[in-house]
Amino acid sequence: MTETPLAGFTVVVTRPARQNDALVQQLQAQGANVVAIPLLAIDPLDAPTQCQKIDRQLHDLQQCQLAIFISQNAAEQTLQAMAERNLVWPAHIQVFAIGSATTAFLAAHGISATSPQQMNSEGLLALPALQQVSGQHCLVFRGLGGRETLAQTLRERNATVDYCELYRRQLPAEAAAHWTKWLSDLQNRTALICINSIETLKHLQAVDPAASLRDNLTLVVPGERVTRAATAAGFAHIITANDATDNAMLHTITLHAAPTGIRHD
């Protein structure tokens, strides 16, 4: 008999649409009722001035010694932009990446990247290879806006740091309607909500400003930063995964669903 430890549990996944597939399959294989409500969309920057800056930075890559990819989205958008310009990644650049998915994506495209076990800026900054960077030029690939810890610390270590911002993180237009409908279907039952970033948490608050049925929802979040943000936002039921990978989120959900946990049916 197939073991289904998540039978009777409802789990909502909120990543951009095509990025949910693997986790959805894993959750369903363990018996969960999975609902996909993307609360994040990745939209490439397309304003003329933004495109001109990206174009200039990508053509000047030969001048960089270091490159950092903040996420898989950053890696995907960068390689897509380079392909559109018929550019090839320079072999001399030392590449760093946050997250195993980012590293795997780059590897699949022939780019070897160093990634910290602690999948955040602090973990990256602790790597031995980034301690002595004086005089080196580092380009950080990311979305519009974000944390400044990485660039600030590398500049304190006398590196020259620039951002190549290729996309914006948006709330999908249909998200609020999907969320409202799902809440009406939920009624008095409970559910687990996978919130993979602070940006996604903000979007959850945007689609549900009245915090409907908040007591019925348990957030599954990666790491202490998102945990603190969720607590500050008023969520009382939070479980914390080691990171945002599918395996870490699934492991945390499965532990929560163990016999000592609360059944969600």
Identify what each model region corresponds to.
Residues M1-D265:
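Signature of uroporphyrinogen-III synthase
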